[in-house]
């Protein structure tokens, strides 16, 4: 057989493989990153971090040894200094899969009634400057606009969201709403049109609170777990720690993993953020989720395994 005939035969074989049953296109694989909301909590000493840890101990780098994401929580209270954000980006570089998400400044979400057009623009500019080092490093997956339960579904509030989307358009945005009035198809379509992620939430479902789901409205899938502490959730006398003092049992973890798998099928990247932070329970829940997703035990911080023995395999 001459070379030309051999080439024709080879081309025919390749074509048959493509058109026939010999060729199977690869299944779509998307990334799920799981990690805690925040990394600086006093009650994590002795539970997650060593007691009496020295100034040289790097808590963020420690978290990046075990998880591929963390949600920046301090940015909710005030925009971080750009040099601090740049430091965070450097400290996670050893984990090449690592990406941040970040909560937007509370002035944009919880103190909006006092803002004017001018002050809103200035506040958004402050957020842009603060997050620029992480965004420019290519490791800011999403900026989360987290609204309280009192933020109801209305034309005025949807118009306010549009303003924020316009002012923060250079970021990949996500929106968390907690009132069930937002759980309607026109709102999800509105987010899709603006390429903004809907943040699914697991929270105590009290009254007209939004229920956990698996909505995907952009390339990013987002899910936040707040725990199910019904007793303290709306108790004004309960402190922050009490509201988020909850450890998910295995059946609830499996339920949430089912939702995450649905999100994973429809998003390019999926983020599951555990916010039940008291005494390291957010890390415990994150590890439980990772084990269910991967069907294999993840690496566990030694002190955390001592506190929560079910993690020790």
Predicted regions and their residues:
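Ser/Thr/Pro/Gly-rich low-complexity, intrinsically disordered segments
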Residues: 5-6
